[in-house]
């Protein structure tokens, strides 16, 4: 198909047209609006867009299949007592590892102002490169071979952008569903796809703006805009769809989501259906086949909702029962006993609802337990902020106060569960060395992985030789949240012959950090107390965040005087961790690929990301030096 339309007819021009004559002006306007051939071309470019999307998804799916098969092969080799099962053995696997290492070094880094507004976050370099490629691809489709001469020049640009805009809608919905084909094929979590979902919406807005602008500018060239708006319904339905689309994009900006998330979800859904209706009314009768790009996302959305509804009904046909426990640091520990939800992937999360604290409200919560732990109960650790978590915290505190006055059995509440979701990261049991890093309640993510590894190591041989667990907390009392779990996991791992080291960095506890100079040196603390508590010091140099005895504090876990009474299996350190020397030492000792998981505030995950990428480059991973690969999975606190 010749999509240039060159040579099909002479260019439209206004010679001999008297625009003061309304009949002649209207006839010329109809010639400008004659899009019978332009619609065919636009449809072809919309299909070309989807050909490109399918190719990208296909490539990502192939890499995902290779990744999953490689991890499964490692575990099978370890079960057969093969040594260095997490190390690529042949030239094919080494070549794949080299390409993977290069891609990770580019994709992992992230530069975002950690001290800025909570809602302002810059994506990772990998996401930025993907978005730039996406933008370039769409703009090439919009402007390539589209220089139609004459009076229909801007009409051609507008029609092309309209087709490309409507072609974005199915992709928009595919990236929004919690159960979606793209996530299944590529092994990408809903949270990561949701970032792309928002950027596809922005691309849709950009294309709609180009469509609106070029059409109106084309009419203005001949003074016909007023005539078009007064004689055609298309501009009015178009401005309605555009206004709704603009609001959809504005309301998804982080400040709006942070302000009232529950309201955002409801209005977002209602507004989206308003956009679909307005878009259907706007699509011209000359291109009714373009509505297939609207019908498809409607079907996809309903399929996602049907699957979610069926799963929700199954989960809650026999509702779970939740018991609550108030803990230090304004944290509530929730334990849910459910006969329906009995299996999940480590690191998965659910939308948890306890009707007693807000009917119809649900809160995303990472499952801190593993299916093999806590008698198959789901355990959550929620920090009290506002809304649901604040209601739960206040209630459990008041209940605890009343229990002190009179002994009563723990009260249980009906708990409704939507999920579990997530957990698309690689299986950490397939790595030679595992590093689990978390901050505050981000420990729920790493703890579930730790408990799963401990259980599996006690029942089978795994590729894992060494494990480092790092937890950054503000107050030493927070350790009690999971002290029993850490003690049990440490025992299981050591019994299985896995080298373990548990390091807990306490950043903001005066009682812990305010001891003598000799004690500081013995425990590895290097915070200058004259500047205030450790958490108040702005550490600009990453090297300055590591305790003086970095090798001792990051080495095998020992029972120090500072940890006997709270967590005997861990080393407690006052200050912040410096990840470069710690990771470098672990990678030096690794005999195969290292898996790193990090969950916590943006500053923590960003530091680990950038350090991992830098170390991989400096060590020339899989580039002939013998240095083994580094896999990183990062989870951030976000909505």
What are these regions, as identified by a protein language model?
Residues 162-163, 191-212, 439-470:
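Classical protein tyrosine phosphatase
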Residues 322-412, 474:
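Ferredoxin-reductase
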Residues 247, 253, 257, 262, ...:
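Membrane-proximal cytosolic interface modules of multi-pass membrane proteins
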Residues 41-55, 95-306:
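Membrane-embedded alpha-helical bundles of multi-pass integral membrane proteins
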Residues 76-112, 320-339, 406, 511, ...:
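Non-transmembrane, juxtamembrane loop and terminal tail segments
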Residues 5-35, 192, 273, 360, ...:
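Reductase modules of NAD(P)H-dependent flavoproteins
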């Amino acid at each position: 198909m010749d999509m240039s339309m060159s040579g099909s007819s002479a260019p439209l021009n206004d010679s001999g047209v008297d625009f003061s004559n309304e009949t002649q002006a209207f006839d010329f306007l109809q010639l400008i609006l004659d899009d019978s051939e332009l619609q065919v071309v636009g449809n072809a470019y919309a299909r070309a867009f989807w050909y490109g999307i399918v190719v990208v998804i296909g490539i990502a799916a192939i890499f995902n299949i290779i990744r999953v098969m490689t991890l499964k092969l490692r575990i099978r080799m370890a079960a057969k007592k093969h040594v260095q099962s997490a190390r690529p053995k042949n030239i094919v696997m080494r070549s794949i590892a080299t390409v993977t290492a290069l891609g990770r070094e580019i994709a992992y880094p992230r530069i975002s102002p950690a001290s800025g507004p909570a809602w302002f976050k810059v994506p990772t370099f990998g996401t930025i490169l993907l978005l730039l490629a996406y933008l370039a691809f769409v703009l090439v489709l919009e402007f390539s071979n589209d220089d139609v001469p004459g009076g229909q020049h801007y009409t051609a640009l507008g029609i092309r952008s309209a087709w490309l805009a409507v072609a974005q809608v199915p992709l928009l919905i595919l990236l929004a569903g919690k159960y979606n084909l793209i996530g299944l094929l590529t092994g990408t979590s809903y949270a990561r796809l949701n970032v792309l979902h928002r950027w596809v919406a922005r691309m849709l807005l950009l294309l709609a703006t180009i469509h609106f602008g070029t059409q109106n500018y084309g009419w203005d060239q001949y003074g016909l805009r007023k005539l078009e708006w007064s004689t055609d319904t298309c501009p009015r339905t178009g401005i309605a769809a555009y206004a709704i689309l603009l609001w959809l994009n504005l309301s998804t900006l982080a400040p709006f989501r942070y302000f009232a998330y529950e309201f955002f979800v409801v209005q977002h859904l209602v507004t989206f259906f308003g956009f679909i209706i307005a878009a259907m009314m706007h699509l011209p009768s000359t291109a009714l086949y373009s509505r297939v790009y609207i019908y498809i996302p409607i079907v996809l959305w309903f399929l996602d909702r049907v699957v979610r509804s069926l799963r929700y009904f199954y989960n809650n046909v026999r509702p779970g029962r939740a018991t609550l426990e108030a803990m230090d640091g304004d944290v509530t520990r929730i334990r849910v006993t459910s006969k329906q939800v009995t299996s999940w992937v480590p690191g998965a999360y659910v939308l948890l609802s306890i009707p007693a604290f807000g009917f119809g409200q649900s809160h995303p919560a990472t499952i801190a337990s593993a299916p093999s732990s806590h008698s198959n109960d789901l355990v959550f650790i929620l920090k009290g902020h506002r809304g649901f978590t604040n209601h739960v915290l206040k209630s459990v505190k008041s209940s605890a106060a009343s229990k002190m006055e009179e002994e009563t059995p723990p009260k249980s509440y009906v708990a409704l569960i939507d999920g579990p979701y997530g957990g698309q990261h690689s299986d950490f049991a397939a790595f030679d060395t595992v590093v689990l890093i978390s901050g505050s309640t981000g420990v729920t993510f790493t703890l579930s992985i730790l408990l799963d590894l401990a259980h599996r190591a006690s029942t089978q041989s795994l590729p894992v030789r060494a494990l480092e667990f790092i937890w950054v907390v503000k107050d030493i009392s927070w350790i009690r949240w999971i002290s029993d779990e850490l003690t049990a996991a440490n025992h299981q791992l050591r019994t299985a012959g896995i080298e373990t080291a548990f390091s807990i960095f306490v950043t903001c506890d005066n009682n812990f950090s305010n001891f003598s100079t000799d004690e500081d040196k013995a425990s590895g603390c290097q915070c200058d107390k004259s500047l205030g508590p450790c958490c108040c010091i702005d550490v600009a140099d990453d090297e300055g965040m590591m305790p003086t005895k970095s090798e001792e504090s990051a080495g095998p876990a020992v029972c120090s005087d500072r940890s006997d009474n709270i967590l005997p299996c861990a080393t407690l350190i006052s200050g912040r961790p410096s990840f470069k020397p710690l990771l470098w030492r672990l990678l030096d000792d690794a005999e195969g690929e290292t898996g790193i998981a990090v969950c916590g505030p943006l500053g923590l995950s960003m530091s680990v990301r950038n350090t991992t990428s830098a170390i991989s480059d400096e060590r020339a991973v899989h580039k002939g030096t013998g240095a083994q690969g580094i896999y990183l999975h990062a989870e951030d606190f976000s909505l």
